[in-house]
Amino acid sequence: MESRVLLRTFCLLFGLGAVWGLGVDPSLQIDVLTELELGESTTGVRQVPGLHNGTKAFLFQDTPRSIKASTATAEQFFQKLRNKHEFTILVTLKQTHLNSGVILSIHHLDHRYLELESSGHRNEVRLHYRSGSHHPHTEVFPYILADDKWHKLSLAISASHLILHIDCNKIYERVVEKPSTDLPLGTSFWLGQRNNAHGYFKGIMQDVQLLVMPQGFIAQCPDLNRTCPTCNDFHGLVQKIMELQDILAKTSAKLSRAEQRMNRLDQCYCERTCTMKGTTYREFESWTDGCKNCTCLNGTIQCETLICPNPDCPLKSAPAYVDGKCCKECKSICQFQGRTYFEGQRNTVYSSSGVCVLYECKDQSMKLVESSGCPALDCAESHQITLSHSCCKVCKGYDFCSERHNCMENSVCRNLNDRAVCSCRDGFRALREDNAYCEDIDECAEGRHYCRENTMCVNTPGSFMCICKTGYIRIDDYSCTEHDECVTNQHNCDENALCFNTVGGHNCVCKPGYTGNGTTCKAFCQDGCRNGGACIAANVCACPQGFTGHSCETDIDECSDGFVQCDSRANCINLPGWYHCECRDGYHDNGMFSPSGESCEDIDECGTGRHSCANDTICFNLDGGYDCRCPHGKNCTGDCIHDGKIKHNGQIWVLENDRCSVCSCQNGFVMCRRMVCDCENPTVDLFCCPECDPRLSSQCLHQNGETLYNSGDTWVQNCQQCRCLQGEVDCWPLPCPEVECEFSVLPENECCPRCVTDPCQADTIRNDITKTCLDEMNVVRFTGSSWIKHGTECTLCQCKNGHICCSVDPQCLQEL
């Protein structure tokens, strides 16, 4: 008991603290009339006395007006309202009798995010909104608000929960699709009208407010009961549970993947390495390759030219090249006969008698090398060559390179008469004097190429290439000429574009009747394609099933055109883009929905009490109806029972809630029909017979601003039935057949949902929280929850009443 009292106290304090006692928190309040700064200079409205004197009241007159919040003011409103799921609309009003008008409208282009409307034509209050699934919805609340009397109206929205209070009485309470307040930039706010031309409210408004808080209706009616928690609070708790469930599933999946990776890592050691000339180097390892310093970085070899220092050599040594190394090092020297020799160098000396003596620099002195004899030569003496480093002669053309040379990277060995020398390959330059090491010459950067105009020079190892620029073709290795891609059909123009050749390229221009950048051209239909039609050629629309016409503007009446054959117990009802076989009076659907109406079965009016037979007669059920029979020998009155009241046989009356319908009692049967319109009768009721109103002022302009309708005309616009009545357009939701099934889908460009058996095709489900799903990680999922399938990045799964439905997100795949 104590906990219940504490909870109630908390709810009262929480609900009241922001609303009254200290007044409404300004950060939660949008005072519309004050913020719009209506005054004497505002066309179409004027200040008048209100229900009370505490705030200003304004009369919205039957004249052209534009009561719209400025862009800055509207954005101030929306900053408070955007992405909020708990708010209340409050208004005190006195609406002119029979007027149908918009109280306030928040819309962007053709999308009504929040619009409150009162129809005096049909005696109902309507709320138009968009749900989180971006579908338009309309809730209709039958109530006479346009009666020239003062009323206080509040509409509280808490997530998917609506409560309508009128004059501090709860009139309606509903669960609906959750409204979306994700208002885009550029959204407009209108008061007393939908736009400049439609939805004019006529009457007085006072205290127009939006309170962004729970149970805002207590600001208008402090004595009303409060509920705790609100529907939005409950939705928040459910959402948190789903989020925690999703976090648990994702954490479990990450842990599983981490364990798998750890197991694999335990079995191997991975390190990025580099391989050069058969040798493998570890990450960050550096080495010298010829005349370059190289490093292994992230598995890639990066080399830079080696900068050789000048060695400071001691006495009896000098800088010299060493085999296998790029830079000079200090080597021992010998002085002999006025010349300098490096360690290991040899020199011959011939005596006066012609005897050859061979010396070698060793340990800083020239030492005698013992002769080991020379091989016999197979050439004439005149073709024998004396060498400076050997006492043995060789024949002309001797291959010194085959003995030994020090030619390294990009260098080749060449034979001279008496020795071998190194020479750089074509396209390379020497890195040192003996040409043992060479580097590539960048002919392109140094301008040492022969590429002519219309080409681009590309350097290659030891050479270069001349590449043709885009739009040119090759003449020879060094030159290119202009290429006509249009003639050779080597362009990227769309099939519905014209190709124009230019210097170095081409231009694409869409053909007349098509629009785009030339590479992509789409057909253009000047009047547009309505009802989901697609423009497939210039001013040619491909219409979806159920529509026809130049712009797909005409609904095909499948019922009158003979396309449909409904069961004898059903009537064919045409709908935009579709049709429906609706059970005739006296029949109802048995729950086994059939498109042709075969599921219609007889209603037992007698057993269910749905008959009008008076107490002195007996009801007999018939197929599709009933009969009121008088017992044998009894004199029956033939009276009827209608709405719980006795109507005498032959009596005629007008329905209380529909002044345009006339009913009569005939021998126990009640028959109702619309009033017959006699336009010749000067006293004809123009409300019931608007077609009898010839005044031009009673005509209406279609929402597109192009079509003019006479009073009484009807049409369908955006899944709403619209009617012109004495100059005012009133639209209400198109009546849809009852969908008695677990899964339903609203096809694109249609107005009414259809039943489907596959839950994965359904966009509307009768959620059953007792039906859960077990995902691939054995995690229990509630109905309505969604998750990314384990092991994937773009497969989204959803639990639908115990069924798991998965689909791949194409946009996610493109972003990978």
Swiss-Prot record:
Q: Please classify the protein's predominant subcellular localization into one broad category.
A: secreted
UniProt GO BP? commissural neuron axon guidance; fertilization
Annotated ranges, domain EGF-like: 397-439, 440-481, 482-522, 523-553, 555-601, 602-637
Q: Which PROSITE patterns match?
A: ASX_HYDROXYL, EGF_1, EGF_2, EGF_3, EGF_CA, VWFC_1, VWFC_2
Q: Which UniProt keywords apply?
A: Calcium, Disulfide bond, EGF-like domain, Glycoprotein, Metal-binding, Repeat, Secreted, Signal
Note the SMART domains from the entry: EGF, EGF_CA, LamG, TSPN, VWC, VWC_out
Report the GO terms under cellular component.
cytoplasm; extracellular region; extracellular space
| Molecular function GO labels | calcium ion binding; heparin binding; protein kinase C binding
Residues linked to a glycan: 53, 225, 293, 298, 517, 548, 615, 635
Cellular localization per UniProt = Secreted
Q: Residue limits of the VWFC domain?
A: 272-331, 638-693, 698-756
Instruction: Give the Laminin G-like domain ranges.
Output: 30-258
The protein's superkingdom reads Eukaryota
Give me the disulphide-bonded residues: 401-413, 407-422, 424-438, 444-457, 451-466, 468-480, 486-499, 493-508, 510-521, 525-535, 529-541, 543-552, 559-572, 566-581, 583-600, 606-619, 613-628, 630-636
Give the binding site residues for Ca(2+): 440-441, 443, 459-460, 463, 555-556, 558, 574-575, 578, 602-603, 605, 621-622, 625
Signal peptide span per the entry?
1-21
Pfam families from the xrefs? EGF_3, EGF_CA, Laminin_G_2, VWC
Q: What SUPFAM superfamilies would the database entry show?
A: Concanavalin A-like lectins/glucanases, EGF/Laminin, FnI-like domain, Growth factor receptor domain
Q: Does the keyword Ribonucleoprotein apply?
A: no
Subunit: Homotrimer. Binds to PRKCB. Interacts with NICOL1; this interaction triggers epididymal differentiation.
Name the job this protein performs: Plays multiple roles in neural tissues, regulates neuronal proliferation, survival, differentiation, polarization, as well as axon guidance and synaptic functions. Plays an important role in axon development during neuronal differentiation through the MAPK intracellular signaling pathway. Via binding to its receptor ROBO3, plays a role in axon guidance, functions as a repulsive guidance cue for commissural axons, helping to steer them across the spinal cord midline. Required for neuron survival through the modulation of MAPK signaling pathways too. Testicular luminal protein that signals through a ROS1-pathway to regulate the epididymal initial segment (IS) maturation, sperm maturation and male fertility.
Q: Which PANTHER family match?
A: NEL HOMOLOG, PROTEIN KINASE C-BINDING PROTEIN NELL2
**The protein's name:** Protein kinase C-binding protein NELL2
Q: Which organism is it from?
A: Bos taurus (Bovine)
